[in-house]
Amino acid sequence: SLKNVIRKELDSIKKEFGSQRKTIVEDAKEAVYVAAPIKEETVYFVMDRFGYSKTMDKATYQRNKENILKEYKFIVPCMNTDKICIFTNLGVMHQIKVLDIPAGKFRDKGVPIDNLCNYDSTKEYIIQVLDAESMIHSSLLFATAKSMLKVMDGELLNAAKRTVQATKLSEDELIEVIPVDWTEESEDKVVLQ
């Protein structure tokens, strides 16, 4: 029958071209791959007035501190495992993992912040940049163009999403976000200019 003919042909092909199995099939435990832990270190997130950003290690920052303070609009010390929080005039907070921001030397140009998060420089502009770790342990004072003030616990903005509405604005514009450490007894004053 046709079935036997096919079997004989397959057996002859197996004998002619067959080889021994190179791997062992066994009932073993599941393979677990452990990624090497990231060494935590202090880095500096810097962004110039054109929105080009990068991180640099502490030694590079210390060597070029004077020039960095002149050339960069935002300078944020943070851990390399932390997140950077960018507040815009629309009341939106964008988050970027520090590990996603390319590290560079002092003279390197950096990467546009538009390419790293959902920030769009054609519709909004940056008013404050903070590191997430210090932000969640302090209160934030929001000030708008119409002189409205709001104090909010930074822990409320600790979210997994990359873009969060930090505060609602009704036909207004956020002009400042200030981290503050107020207590019930403190009598700190805020002066808007």
Which ranges hold each PLM region?
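C-terminal interaction appendages of subunits in large macromolecular complexes
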Residues: 1-193
